[in-house]
A protein has these predicted regions:
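A generic structural signal for well-ordered coil/turn residues at beta-strand boundaries
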Residues: 62, 77-79, 99, 118-124, ...
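Short amphipathic C-terminal alpha-helix that caps PH/PH-like domains
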Residues: 138-148
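Class II aminoacyl-tRNA synthetase-like tRNA-binding/catalytic domains
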Residues: 2-136, 194-195, 216, 321
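Conserved structured core elements
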Residues: 26-30, 34, 42, 47, ...
């Protein structure tokens, strides 16, 4: 029949063709991006671009990469490729090759992350400063966020405290000295029933539970809160400072009760990095997660020599949420996953 066929795409999509963010918010996004680039330009950081599609995924058991398969020149039998979860590894390769201090603004991808403050595809602002440690980089993050948000909202005086101090203040326990059983008892005392099944062998799941439920809700209320010196077992790609207890030289930044940034005094020891990759892979195997090979090109760069530096990844979409008072990520994205 003449005229028969599927309805126009817009009608069949039930209105999902429209952006979920308002035009005012989308214009604000553009303005904030321009301010961020201006902030870096004033400090003479080089903007870089690295591949979104990589031969290596993340070994981190807490993060799953999107995978795809490449067929073509250079891989006659095909090969698995990964959408990056962070530009960290190739940026460190640039640092080892002599780039100097650098930054990047890019889209990254993480499997299974969706919700009020998560989207499988999101924007990171990531930068590395030569000669800096995690305390110096906390100053940088504080300065960038305060300056970029200045036209949208004013913030109170930032607060800084160690991971231990935050736990002692809001949970009433020393997170470094408490056993898993003691942390479980603490969770029960605070009425947390979601810890069932975490077991008594590893303290970190209990620390994460207590942090997310009892500490983070108090952080960043009208001001930036910066936590630093995390348990050594949570070092990820940060250096560990010897002591009693040893601590990871890393920090997280919170605003409006949500994590905004995560930074490290970067590990430069290739042997230690390889050992951490292997620990991650063991945990993935025991948890039944997909196997991921370590990034050999990163390890080669560390062998060549990573300069002393600190790096941080800041969630740009959450920064926009903070600027305009949004409660859900979809309010600051043109097309969240449901509309992609």
């Amino acid at each position: 029949m003449s005229g028969a066929g599927p309805p126009p795409r817009g009608e069949g999509a039930g209105g999902l063709w429209r952006p979920s963010a308002s035009w005012d918010v989308l214009r604000l996004r553009a303005a904030l991006l321009a301010r961020i680039r201006g902030w870096f330009a004033a400090r003479d950081l080089l903007e870089v671009e690295t591949p979104v599609l990589s031969a290596a995924g993340t070994t981190d058991p807490q993060i799953e990469s999107f995978t795809t398969h490449y067929h073509g020149p250079g891989a006659p039998y095909g090969c698995t490729a990964y959408l990056h979860t962070s530009p960290e590894f190739p940026m460190k390769r640039l640092l080892a090759a002599g780039s100097g201090s650098i930054y990047q603004i890019c889209r990254v991808f993480r499997q299974g992350e969706a919700g009020a403050r998560h989207n499988p595809e999101f924007t990171l602002v990531e930068w590395y400063c030569i000669g800096a440690d995690h305390h110096t980089l906390m100053d940088e993050v504080q300065g960038l966020v305060t300056e970029v948000l200045a036209g949208s909202r004013s913030l109170g005086e930032p607060e800084r405290m160690s991971y231990r101090t935050a736990f002692e203040r809001h949970v009433g326990v020393d997170p470094h000295g408490a056993s898993p059983a003691q942390l479980r008892t603490c969770a029960a005392r605070h009425g947390l029933e979601t810890g069932a099944g975490l077991g008594d062998r590893d303290a970190d799941p209990w620390r994460d539970l207590l942090l997310s439920h009892l500490v983070v809700p108090h952080l960043g209320r009208g001001r930036l809160s910066l936590l630093y010196d995390y348990p050594a077992s949570q070092a990820s790609l940060a250096r560990v400072r010897p002591g009693d207890p040893p601590v990871a030289e890393r920090f997280e930044v919170f605003l409006d009760g949500m994590e905004l940034a995560n930074g490290f005094h970067e590990l430069a020891d290739a042997g230690e990095q390889h050992r951490r990759f292997e620990r991650d892979r063991y945990r993935r195997r025991t948890a039944g997660q997909p196997s991921v090979a370590p990034d050999e090109r990163l390890l080669a760069a560390l062998v060549a020599g990573l300069p002393d530096c600190a790096g941080v990844a800041l969630g740009f979409d959450r920064l926009v949420m903070a600027a305009c008072g949004a409660r859900r990520l979809e309010e600051v994205l043109a097309f969240p996953f449901e509309r992609a």
